[in-house]
Amino acid sequence: DRGRVYYYMEDYSNAKKELLEATKKDNTEALLLLGMVYLAQDDVENAQAMYKQYISAVGDSAKGYNGLALCDIRNGDYDSALDNITKGLPTATTDEMQSLLFNEIVAYEKKLDFATALTKAQEYVDMFPEDSAAKKELAFLKTRTSSEG
């Protein structure tokens, strides 16, 4: 648990040290957190490796696929991100689904597919009306799509 605390304190070098130790003890949650640490340090390659290891250890996992999607978005591979989001949705809890669907909006927006991003954002805000960041995103996307035609 110290690795998690270090991660949230943004002390990534200590987090990495603790989490690497935990992975040696077959702690699969540590793989997930290690992926987050690597991604926070812009080490996308190692982050992807951790998320893939996590998925192979626990099976299909919304958290693992969401991590891979975040790596793909960081790398500019939006189609792969959307593929990983699709793979993660069937096993997602409500919180995980919220994260996956928000990242889906981001991926479409980064692809400059504002019409699809707008549709996804409207669906998202209907499902998660309390998400103020998504409401801002929706307002932004409306400006992007109304000026297209």
Locate the predicted segments by residue.
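Start-of-helix register in tetratricopeptide repeats
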Residues: 4, 29-32, 63, 96-99, ...
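Register position in tetratricopeptide repeats
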Residues: 8-9, 40-41, 74-75, 110, ...
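Canonical positions in the second alpha-helix
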Residues: 21-22, 53-54, 87-88, 123-124
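Canonical tetratricopeptide repeat
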Residues: 1, 33-36, 67, 103, ...
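Short coil turns that delineate tetratricopeptide repeat
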Residues: 24-27, 59, 93-95, 129
